[in-house]
From Swiss-Prot:
Family named by the database record: Belongs to the bacterial ribosomal protein bL21 family.
GO biological process, one term: translation
Assembly notes: Part of the 50S ribosomal subunit. Contacts protein L20.
Entry-linked InterPro entries: bL21-like, bL21-like_sf, Ribosomal_bL21
Pfam families attached to this UniProt entry: Ribosomal_L21p
Described function: This protein binds to 23S rRNA in the presence of protein L20.
Domain of life: Bacteria
Alphabetized UniProt keyword annotations: Ribonucleoprotein, Ribosomal protein, RNA-binding, rRNA-binding
Protein name: Large ribosomal subunit protein bL21
Molecular function GO labels: rRNA binding; structural constituent of ribosome
GO terms under cellular component: cytoplasm; ribonucleoprotein complex; ribosome
Length: 105
């Protein structure tokens, strides 16, 4: 069974025991979280498609870790002006493991 969930402005296709990196959630390692914005749930031709979400469906997950992404460098240089600026950014991420997919009753 699989599901498509929406979190952090992105959509993810998940199945049981999947480990995925998503945008930061306010939770610590070991906490249980539940995603209620389920767009599609099912298996094969028996998939239920929501409009926009499947009523009563949810995906349960466990927070594995809070991490940070790779550094992205923003570099600006103004030619012939002896002027430049370098700035770095690291995005915060949450690593979760999908524990259960609950279909609508």
């Amino acid at each position: 069974m699989f599901a498509v969930i929406k979190t952090g402005g992105k959509q993810y296709r998940v199945a049981a025991n999947d480990v995925l990196t998503i945008e930061k959630l306010e939770a610590s390692a070991g906490d249980s979280i539940e995603f209620t914005e389920v767009l599609v749930i099912g298996e094969g031709a028996d998939a239920a498609i929501g409009a926009p979400f499947v009523a009563g469906a949810s995906v349960k997950a466990e927070v594995v870790d809070q991490t940070r992404g790779k550094k992205v460098i923003a570099f600006k240089k103004r030619r012939r002006q002896n002027s430049k600026r370098s700035r770095g950014h690291r995005q915060h991420h949450t690593v979760v493991r999908i524990t259960d997919i609950v279909a609508a009753k």
